[in-house]
Amino acid sequence: MFAALGSAVPVAAGAATGKPHRGTVLRAKPAQVSIGPRTVTTWTYDGRLPGPRIEATAGGLVRAKLVNGLPADTTVHWHGIRLDARMDGAPGYTQKAVPPGGTFDYVFTVPDPGTYFYHSHVGMQNDRGLYGTLIVADPHEPLGYDEEFTVVLDDWVDGVGGTPDEALRRLNASTAHDDTLRSTLLGGVVGELRHPYHLINGRAAETPEVFVSKPGRLVRFRVINAAADTAFRVALGGHRMAVTHTDGFPCAPVTVDTFLIGMGERYDFLVRLGDGAFPLVAEAEGKRARAFAIVSTSHRAPAPAATCGCAS
């Protein structure tokens, strides 16, 4: 299967160094972020969307200090990681919630390499921007590739259609269901809300993220669905993708035109890039909306439109 991608080369980005994680401070606090043409006030880690990228090596320790600058209790959950339950971030079950002004030290071993993420586990806080990536390198990485990019998908309402909590209250008070939110997959129902924006790495389609590479490079994409209510169908225009990992773990490689990623899931794929500018599109399954980014290997190529063949 990999013959179609060309010969493997030594991995450059994301390679394990064997060095321990130096520690991260996650400052949960209100901040202003740009969502398309709007500037909204939301909750973030360190004023960033997504929050800081944490990198570790399988078998090593992660050290992260949560500093709660929010007007509400909070925690951090490490999504997909096998760890000591005391570090899992489930308030009322594995730890006490961290109050406003409080701190908590998360210290745990990451046993498995792969693509993971972290997020608040209190109420609707994950929907307000409290999430970030956790990439665990394999010290014996079997794949050879030139570089890697991380793609974080999200659906967004905070500061545009009220807060996520307000949107949930409106939904619970209504007896109607939007029957247009349908799919032939996922049991037919693909969500409860229409979100004003769908994001890639915190950016809306009006001001898309641009991944810059070179023609012929073999690139690993790590795709994380951090959305609360949206499954996405992902495609890279003009390319087929070799899916190599699901939820952090290696799988039998499958070459596809598109793949469907549910909430909380992660997929890794390899692709050898062509020459030009290509749309990376994540169709919101059953919602007639999309997240959009650009993969560019040529400064001469025009920016693509936010469409590609992601038929649902």
Describe the role of every protein-language-model region.
Residues M1-A3:
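N-terminal export leaders
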Residues L5, A12-K29, T39, L130-R170, ...:
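Extended terminal and domain-junction accessory segments
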Residues P20-L143, D229-F259, P279-R290:
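Histidine- and aromatic-enriched segments that form or immediately flank copper-ligand environments
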Residues T42, D46-R53, D105, H195, ...:
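Non-catalytic, beta-strand-enriched accessory regions in extracellular/secretory proteins
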Residues I54-A58, V210-L218, R272:
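Extracellular and analogous surface-interaction loops
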Residues L61, S213-L218, L260-E265:
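Conserved "landmark" site that anchors the functional core of diverse proteins
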Residues E148-L218, I224-A227:
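Acidic-aromatic/histidine active-site loop/patch
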Residues N225-A227, L236, L273-D275:
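A generic beta-sheet turn/junction motif
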